[in-house]
């Protein structure tokens, strides 16, 4: 099998399947999930064997940036629910209205602060807070791609997605 030049959980079905399977196994491995949830940085995640299961499965089919994937794994440990029928990007989920409110689930100010983040460890903490604001229910492939490929292009895409969905002020 030829190795893909880059990893994408939204564009490559095989990589998406590996990530989903790995995440679903959390339900049967509460100790592993708890170990990942206690980590405060990608550097700490490197010491968790459960992370390496994901890394080793993915490295067979695509080039993997270990630190970026570690951030994905750590943040994924905070995801409680994955609605596979959800076709919205993570940024659109952030912009969706709170139940019974005209306010977005993630405020405009918090979203703009997120887009200003360049430091990987700061991104890690910010995204854990975002997952919590979303009630732990997110689109897993979209979240994973955004974290893995955190750069200007990702930020731009997220901005367009968020502001396409966000309630407008009159």
Report residues per predicted region:
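Basic, alpha-helical nucleic-acid-binding regions used in initiation and control of genome expression
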Residues: 2-5, 9-170
């Amino acid at each position: 099998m030829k190795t893909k030049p880059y990893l994408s959980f939204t564009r490559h079905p095989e990589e998406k399947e590996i990530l989903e399977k790995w995440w679903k196994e959390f339900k049967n491995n509460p100790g592993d999930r708890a170990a990942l949830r206690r980590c405060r940085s990608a550097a700490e995640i490197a010491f968790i064997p459960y992370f390496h299961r994901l890394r080793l499965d993915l490295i067979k089919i695509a080039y993997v940036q270990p630190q970026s994937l570690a951030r994905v794994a750590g943040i994924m440990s905070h995801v409680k629910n994955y609605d596979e029928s959800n076709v919205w990007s993570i940024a659109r989920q952030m912009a969706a209205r709170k139940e019974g409110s005209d306010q977005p689930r993630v405020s405009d100010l918090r979203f703009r602060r997120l887009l200003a983040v360049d430091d990987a460890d700061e991104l890690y903490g910010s995204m854990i807070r975002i997952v919590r604001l979303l009630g732990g229910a997110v689109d897993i492939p979209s979240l994973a791609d955004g974290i893995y490929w955190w750069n200007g292009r990702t930020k731009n895409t997220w901005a367009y997605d968020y502001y396409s969905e966000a309630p407008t002020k009159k």
